[in-house]
């Protein structure tokens, strides 16, 4: 039987662009693993994407996954926009390069082995796991140690 996994994510950026961090919780059968890391210069959208990517990349086998995010950018991007971006060679409808394409490609690859259900939760509305992820992300953003090599000013 396929493992049933829950993932909760959040990203934070102090300035946007500025120092940023992500936080994620991976839950399986009552056990939890948390992830967070801070970056010197990045954006909130990149950190929202990184939270989902890092948690998914931690899975060692195919799983049924429910991912909860407060990011409409991530949820809509992966459930609605990515199919056309790929068809257009990673261009938007107005033929501009997709922002954060490095992370969208990485997220797409990380999803490929799993059955995914995306759930949107309202941020800062008392959702316990979202609040914990927000705390993890903000703590990481306040102590950045990584360089976001994929960040491009203006994205």
UniProtKB/Swiss-Prot annotation:
Classification via PROSITE patterns: RNASE_H_1 (PS50879)
Coiled coil: none
HAMAP family: RNase_H
UniProt-recorded Gene Ontology molecular function terms: magnesium ion binding; nucleic acid binding; RNA-DNA hybrid ribonuclease activity
InterPro entries cross-referenced by the UniProt entry: RNase_H (IPR050092), RNaseH-like_sf (IPR012337), RNaseH_domain (IPR002156), RNaseH_sf (IPR036397), RNaseHI (IPR022892)
Known cofactor(s): Mg(2+)
Organism superkingdom: Bacteria
EC number: 3.1.26.4
Species of origin: Enterobacter sp. (strain 638)
GO annotation, biological process: DNA replication, removal of RNA primer
Protein name: Ribonuclease H
């Amino acid at each position: 039987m396929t493992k049933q996994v829950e993932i909760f994510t959040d990203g934070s950026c102090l300035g946007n662009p500025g120092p940023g961090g992500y936080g994620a919780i991976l839950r399986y059968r009552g056990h939890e693993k948390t992830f967070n890391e801070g970056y010197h210069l990045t954006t909130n959208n990149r950190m929202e994407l990184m939270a989902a990517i890092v948690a998914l990349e931690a899975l060692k086998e195919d799983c049924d996954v429910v991912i909860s995010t407060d990011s409409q950018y991530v949820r809509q991007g992966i459930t609605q926009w990515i199919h056309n971006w790929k068809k257009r060679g990673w261009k938007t409808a107005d033929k501009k390069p997709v922002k954060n394409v490095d992370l969208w490609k990485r997220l797409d690859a990380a999803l490929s082995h799993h059955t995914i259900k995306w759930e949107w939760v309202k941020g800062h509305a008392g959702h316990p796991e979202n609040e914990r992820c927000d705390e993890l992300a903000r703590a990481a953003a306040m102590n950045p140690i990584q360089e976001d090599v994929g960040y491009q000013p203006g994205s």
